[in-house]
């Protein structure tokens, strides 16, 4: 059964997906095309007037493992700077800096069957790297999604749009 969620909603995967052992969390996005054509036109480009400081929008997926509903230790955060949880049950598959390409741009693989018992929740979050410094926000991306897939059957469990 696939569930569609909106921002901030929660889903209990074990409730509706009996036997779910390993999930893939996939994050995808595309940079929105600037309205009005973008870089200032032909002459701006020709004479150096086009924007040259543009930085790609870098969305990042992270998994936070909670004990009794609380974040206790920074090693329980799995992200581009800590690709593997100490238990080996949560693995970030690498950082995509641009969102280019089709399908998942970043993935986190979670082996639910091996998560140590002291962890009661895993929270998935998405942020834009250095968003304030780069003056970027989520309205600057399009076609964004987070999907949870059963790694064994490749069946979608949840989709967040």
Model segments located where?
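Intrinsic-disorder/low-complexity signal
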Residues: 1-161
């Amino acid at each position: 059964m696939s569930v569609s969620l909106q921002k901030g909603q929660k889903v209990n995967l074990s409730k509706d997906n009996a036997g779910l052992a390993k999930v893939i969390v996939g994050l995808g996005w595309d940079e929105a095309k600037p309205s009005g054509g973008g870089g200032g036109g032909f002459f701006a480009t020709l004479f150096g007037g086009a924007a040259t400081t543009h930085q790609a929008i870098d969305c990042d997926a992270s998994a936070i493992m909670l004990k009794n509903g609380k974040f206790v230790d920074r090693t329980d955060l799995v992200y581009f700077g800590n690709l593997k949880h100490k238990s080996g049950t949560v693995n970030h598959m690498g950082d995509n800096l641009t969102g280019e390409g089709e399908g998942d741009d970043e993935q986190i693989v979670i082996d639910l069957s091996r998560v140590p018992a002291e962890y009661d929740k895993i929270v998935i979050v998405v942020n834009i790297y250095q968003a304030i410094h780069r003056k970027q926000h989520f309205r600057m991306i399009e076609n964004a999604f987070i999907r949870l897939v059963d790694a064994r059957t490749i069946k979608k469990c949840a989709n967040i749009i």
